[in-house]
Regions:
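Short, low-complexity, intrinsically disordered N-terminal peptides in bacterial proteins
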Residues: 1-2, 228
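ABC family nucleotide-binding domain
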Residues: 4-210, 214-217
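Short amphipathic beta-strand/extended segments with alternating polar/hydrophobic composition
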Residues: 74, 225-228
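H-loop (His-switch) and adjacent beta-strand-loop-beta switch element
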Residues: 214-226
Length: 228
């Protein structure tokens, strides 16, 4: 099987004061279509930095990332932005919804940015809201929803343009245990059904059971299972 996403020897260093901070140290990984991979590590281990680089939001100091055969370091900034909008979906711990827009409008935001025609956009949004179980909440605004419902909206929005890659950074961090497991189970089902690849960063070991594979990150480097 040819990997959908490849990261090769990725390193990233930040300078804070007079001291360099090695956020990532020679990280290599592959993500396959239809696969949900958990990225497990403590706060500060480099999870968010790795997601930002894999998603094209940041550039590595060394190494490269390849998405669907395209090397990100060879793309212009405009091409990288286009790739992010069309092929990468992001889900964040804080949901990132626009409070003054309805649920329907929030899910449709990335499709408006890609200039989808109105009829196609509305059909896609309706389909996604049914998929995540929020058809009855289409005209609600985010503040009227529970945390779990808001994260379902965020997942629907991330999947709106049918991206090849889904990146989720602590998507259950603001949810209670039961709701978090429901959200991850939904994410798992959607990834398997859509054929996208997903990389989910978490510090919660309880979510590992929903992953097809688990990667452990410690001090910016991938390591074996620390509990083994």
């Amino acid at each position: 099987m040819s990997a959908l996403v490849v990261a090769e020897n990725v390193s990233r260093t930040f300078v804070r004061g007079a001291s360099p901070v090695h956020a990532l140290r020679g990280v290599s990984l592959e993500l396959n279509a239809g696969e949900l991979v958990a990225l497990v590590g403590r706060s500060g281990s480099g999870k968010t930095t790795l997601l930002n680089i894999v998603g094209g939001l940041d550039r590595p100091d060394e190494g490269e990332v390849i998405i669907d055969g395209r090397k990100l370091n060879q793309l212009s900034e405009a091409a990288r932005q286009r790739l992010r909008r069309e092929q990468v979906g992001f889900v964040f711990q804080s949901f990132g919804l626009l409070p003054f827009l309805s649920v329907r409008e929030n899910v449709g935001v990335p499709l408006r940015m890609l200039r989808w025609r109105t009829r196609a956009r509305e059909a896609r949004v309706t389909e996604l809201l049914a998929t995540v179980g929020l058809s009855d909440h289409a005209e609600h605004r985010p503040p009227e929803l529970s945390g779990g419902q808001q994260q379902r909206v965020a997942i629907a929005r991330a999947l709106a343009p049918s991206p090849h890659l889904l990146l989720a950074d602590e998507p259950t961090g603001q949810l209670d245990s039961e709701t978090g497991q429901q959200v991850i189970a939904l994410l798992q089902r959607l990834v398997h059904d859509s054929g996208s690849a997903a990389l989910v960063a978490t510090h919660d070991p309880a979510l590992v059971s929903f992953a097809d594979r688990v990667l452990y990150l410690r001090d910016g480097a991938l390591v074996g299972d620390p509990s083994a």
